[in-house]
Amino acid sequence: MERFAVILAAGKGTRMKSKLYKVLHPVLGKPMVEHVVDQLDQIGVSRQIVIVGHGAEAVQDTLGTRVEYAVQEEQLGTGHAVQMAEAELAGKSGATLVVCGDTPLLTAETLEALLAHHEAQQAKVTVLTAIADDATGYGRVVRGEDGNVTKVVEHKDASEAELAINEINTGTYVFDNELLFDALKQVGNNNAQGEYYLPDVISIAKEAGEVVAAHTAPTFDETIGVNDRVALSQAEAIMRKRTNERLMREGVTFMDPASTYISPDVVIGSDTVIYPGTVILGKTTIGSECVIGPNSDIRNSVIEDHAVVRQSVVTDSRIGEAAQVGPFAHLRQQAVLGANTRVGNFVEIKKSTFGDGAKASHLSYIGDASIGERVNLGCGSITVNYDGKNKFETVVEDDAFVGCNVNLIAPVKVGKGAIVAAGSTITSDVPEEALAIARERQTNKEGYTKR
């Protein structure tokens, strides 16, 4: 059976009180709707239609060509929103999963189980339900003796007996695709809000004698919809705990899981130790037996085995095996460190490569540079790479030694095995194995202070 998905992402999200489109608010560094799309990618959905409205361009910029889009110009209810996908999906045979773009905690495993239950029950509609400790405000799921759904009743319309039910409608469904769009044509808007509600399809299917099934999510937390900043914080806390516990089960040590923020896409090898206050986001991979933190921020980077990163910021970079970074270093924009390198206190590296064994231990800026193997950059070494209009490259070849407080005015090359004396400002290439001195000779004026 072919699988389709409709993601509802057109709501304005007024309760967020934000200029940012609701489904683009991040949970552990990734927009909510992108979490949903990632899970759908894992379960073999052939087409994903995202229903957009307010802020459509921002959603399209985020998701790109991974999905298709349909625009809901007016927000006239969830049923009306799904109808916007009719041009793409009407008449096709298969199952259509309808999910909300503000449910970032839904997992591929739960969605797969929901679809499997739908097929096993030969249902036309299957509702994802959850058991709530406090069901106030949620629609209740009423089941018949056969376990199938007889109706979904909104809280305000529920009887005393129905209010006692703690199984709630999560707003996630699977529909027979052809039935879905046929039934939506019969949905009216004769209600207080004047909107077309998707759950009305359930009643239409029941009246037609079709099977309406229900599958219960493993936990209520997984089904949370984010409507305000409080729920956003709750979702992030749940996802953080879920991610950290998975990594611990895979052999990663957390000194304080509650103060460590790691996105679910991050891969970390066994016997790595994560210290408190660490943030690791994006497409980051960390090897085995590393030490990360405390208080480090790592994004979209690769860190190889046995490396140490302490109290540093690393973005879009690569750190080689057994390298040591920090404290208080900043690697960004394609900084690449080889094995056994050392980058120390208050060193910033941008768009540069360090060969194996190279060191910049203190107070340096290295930008647009190629640093060879076993090079030593002394305290205060600076690559002067920008003339106000253009960036230029600095090359320091293998085994060169650059003394303290040296300015390398790019474009410039320091040859293999060369030495640059401390305090020099280098404007011309330094030959291999040469000593370059570019500073004023010292003059002592005897008795000067007695005048």
Swiss-Prot record:
Cofactor(s) in the UniProt record: Mg(2+)
Region (Pyrophosphorylase): 1-229
Binding-site list for Mg(2+): D102, N227
Binding site for UDP-N-acetyl-alpha-D-glucosamine: 8-11, 22, 72, 77-78, 139, 154, 169, 227, 332, 350, 365, 376
One GO molecular-function entry: UDP-N-acetylglucosamine diphosphorylase activity
Cell location: Cytoplasm
Swiss-Prot/TrEMBL catalytic activity: alpha-D-glucosamine 1-phosphate + acetyl-CoA = N-acetyl-alpha-D-glucosamine 1-phosphate + CoA + H(+); N-acetyl-alpha-D-glucosamine 1-phosphate + UTP + H(+) = UDP-N-acetyl-alpha-D-glucosamine + diphosphate
Region of interest called Linker, as start-end residue ranges on this chain: 230-250
Gene3D superfamilies linked: Hexapeptide repeat proteins, Spore Coat Polysaccharide Biosynthesis Protein SpsA, Chain A
One of the protein's GO biological processes: regulation of cell shape
Keyword entries, A-Z: Acyltransferase, Cell shape, Cell wall biogenesis/degradation, Cytoplasm, Magnesium, Metal-binding, Multifunctional enzyme, Nucleotidyltransferase, Peptidoglycan synthesis, Repeat, Transferase
Binding site for acetyl-CoA: N385, Y386, A422, R439
Pathway terms, separated by semicolons: Nucleotide-sugar biosynthesis; UDP-N-acetyl-alpha-D-glucosamine biosynthesis; N-acetyl-alpha-D-glucosamine 1-phosphate from alpha-D-glucosamine 6-phosphate (route II): step 2/2; Nucleotide-sugar biosynthesis; UDP-N-acetyl-alpha-D-glucosamine biosynthesis; UDP-N-acetyl-alpha-D-glucosamine from N-acetyl-alpha-D-glucosamine 1-phosphate: step 1/1; Bacterial outer membrane biogenesis; LPS lipid A biosynthesis
Cofactor note: Binds 1 Mg(2+) ion per subunit.
EC number: 2.7.7.23, 2.3.1.157
Keyword tRNA processing applies: no
Catalytic site: H362 (proton acceptor)
GO cellular component entries: cytoplasm; membrane
Residue numbers spanned by region N-acetyltransferase: 251-451
Pfam family, one: Hexapep
Ranges that cross the membrane: none
Record text on subunit structure and interactions: Homotrimer.
Function: Catalyzes the last two sequential reactions in the de novo biosynthetic pathway for UDP-N-acetylglucosamine (UDP-GlcNAc). The C-terminal domain catalyzes the transfer of acetyl group from acetyl coenzyme A to glucosamine-1-phosphate (GlcN-1-P) to produce N-acetylglucosamine-1-phosphate (GlcNAc-1-P), which is converted into UDP-GlcNAc by the transfer of uridine 5-monophosphate (from uridine 5-triphosphate), a reaction catalyzed by the N-terminal domain.
Family stated for the protein in its record: In the N-terminal section; belongs to the N-acetylglucosamine-1-phosphate uridyltransferase family. In the C-terminal section; belongs to the transferase hexapeptide repeat family.
Name recorded for this polypeptide: Bifunctional protein GlmU
Origin organism lineage: Bacteria, Bacillati, Bacillota, Bacilli, Bacillales
